[in-house]
Amino acid sequence: VKSALEPEWEAVFEPNSYGFRPGRSAHDAIQAIFTAISQKPKFVLDADISKCFDRINHKRLLEKLDTFPTFRRQIRAWLNAGVMDGKELFPTSEGTPQGGVISPLLANIALHGMENEIKSIAKGFNMKKPNGHQLSWQIKQRSVNIIRYADDFVILHEDITVVHRCKEV
């Protein structure tokens, strides 16, 4: 299932997503951060999505997958299989199986769209040129850097208020 899903999703994943992806590494994420801050000094929001893998909403993930019914049923079965702790089985109503081969891909699918969502919201921020004129929405979007490695991400911008507004999102 992973071998079938991964190429499809790799073709659409956001450009600044680095964790658990073929041909991408933590070094690539660090290079992206370095490139962003080398252009201009920037404020940084360093964030971690708390218990991300444990809290993935099964229903939303399955809706987002939009794949063959057979794959959906299999993935749903994996997600709902439960977790063994000793001899006791605990049901799972959310999250991905820890250590599961497909879990990192499912987490990336669940988080896909975060970068575009934040950049889309940034279009409405009050960002101005030094002369007081409002920046175009395209420049506003490009000025916000979001770099994600699995459930860790940074948001970089030269204006601290923009970073704070992104944090609220």
Model region roles, listed by residue range:
Residues V12-V169:
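Conserved polymerase palm-domain catalytic core
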Residues K2-P7, A11, F20:
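Active-site substrate-recognition loop segments, prototypically the cytochrome P450 B′-helix/B-C loop
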